[in-house]
């Protein structure tokens, strides 16, 4: 029996490796379309012999795109970047690249197309990342009206760039940044429990709704099969919303490191982002600061994980398992930190 073929663009990345495992378990032949097939060769062990097929393709090259989707029943586009560098910019990747994939899928009579976007995608956003994600969605629908759009919040999992980054930061500094909080403490006079309370964090700053990478992968597989998914947009978030302060407190508690949480103004972050973005693979960019200015949570009334039959996994159930490597060990544990 010939197995159905699912082409996954960007399948060697963080979400991709989890999606490939889910698709293989679901019985599909997975064609991993990446610029360098060697980057995806390690994923072949996730399936039977011949089930996982690394494939050379570039979303900017129509010839390789056509070959990558030829004979495929479904296509998933995971390709995205967090920062720009030279020709690798948001417009080329998130907008034109997405349009190219959709055009190739339509020309090949592919049955299903799933595009991974992001919560906050909006052409009126102050962040180019969000603007180009929204433009990419529009381009996808123009070429492939029955596409399914998946918008995840911050994705967490063993290889994530969010929690791992801040946990690593906590190993080297006594101060942890929180975003979107009042820079000047709020004085609250004559409250129920004191004459004067000093509020350093306000409402806790920017809000996030982290979603587990395995849940995202399961949702994509479900979207490829669900009869009512074509033409729909889903926003994926975990079961809880956390403020910037909540996240830093949870993270430092998990790794057993007490740290001072300091509100950092966006203007200060923007200066550093502007400076750091001038080097390859920057830790922070100006555009990322603009993204932090907006809450990253599921919109009211949006279709969610539940609509795809996936139960959201709490961050507290997963984070300790892979952040434990950031805990104090040896001489660190014996000293006061």
Q: Which role fits each region the language model picked out?
A:
Residues 28-38:
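Conserved glycine-rich Rossmann-like NAD(P)H-binding loop of the short-chain dehydrogenase/reductase
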Residues 37-107, 119-123, 224:
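NAD(P)H-binding glycine-rich loop region in Rossmannoid oxidoreductase-like domains
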Residues 15-19, 101, 136, 220:
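Hydrophobic residues within alpha-helices
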Residues 5, 73-74, 112:
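Structural motif
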Residues 124-255:
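Oxidoreductase cofactor-interface core, primarily capturing Rossmann-like NAD(P)-dependent enzymes
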Residues 217-285, 298-337:
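Mid/C-terminal beta-alpha module of Rossmann-like enzyme folds, strongest
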Residues 2-28:
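N-terminal Rossmann NAD(P)H-binding glycine-rich loop of SDR-like oxidoreductase domains
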Residues 29, 81-143, 147-155:
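Conserved Rossmann-fold NAD(P)-dependent oxidoreductase catalytic core, especially the SDR/UDP-sugar
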């Amino acid at each position: 029996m010939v197995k159905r073929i699912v082409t996954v663009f960007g399948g060697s990345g963080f979400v991709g490796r989890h999606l490939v495992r889910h698709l293989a378990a679901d019985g599909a032949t997975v064609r991993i379309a990446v610029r360098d097939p060697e980057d995806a060769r390690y994923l072949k062990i996730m399936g039977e012999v011949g089930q996982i097929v690394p494939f050379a393709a570039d979303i900017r090259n129509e010839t390789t795109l056509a070959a990558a989707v030829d004979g495929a029943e479904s296509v998933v586009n995971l390709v995205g970047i967090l920062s720009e560098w030279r020709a690798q910019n948001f417009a080329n990747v998130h907008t034109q690249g997405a349009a190219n994939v959709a055009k190739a899928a339509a020309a090949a009579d592919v049955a299903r197309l799933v595009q991974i976007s992001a919560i906050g995608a909006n052409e009126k956003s102050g962040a180019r990342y969000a603007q180009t994600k929204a433009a990419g969605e529009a381009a996808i629908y123009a070429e492939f009206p029955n596409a399914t759009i998946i918008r995840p919040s911050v994705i967490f999992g063993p290889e994530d760039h969010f929690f791992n980054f801040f946990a690593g930061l906590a190993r080297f500094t006594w101060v942890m940044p929180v975003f979107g909080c009042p820079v000047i403490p709020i004085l609250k006079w004559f409250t129920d429990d004191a004459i004067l309370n000093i509020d350093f964090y306000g409402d806790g700053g920017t809000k996030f709704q982290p979603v587990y990478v395995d849940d995202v992968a399961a949702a994509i597989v479900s979207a490829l099969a669900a009869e009512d998914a074509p033409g729909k947009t889903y926003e994926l978030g975990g079961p809880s919303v956390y403020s910037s302060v909540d996240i830093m407190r949870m993270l430092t508690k998990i790794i057993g490191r007490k740290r001072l949480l300091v509100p950092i103004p966006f203007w200060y972050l923007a200066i550093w982002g502007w400076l750091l973005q001038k080097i390859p693979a920057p830790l922070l960019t100006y555009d990322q600061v603009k993204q932090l200015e907006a809450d990253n949570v599921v919109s009211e009334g949006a279709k969610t994980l539940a609509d795809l039959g996936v139960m959201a996994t709490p961050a507290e159930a997963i984070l300790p398992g892979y952040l434990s490597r950031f805990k104090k060990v040896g001489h660190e544990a014996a000293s006061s930190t």
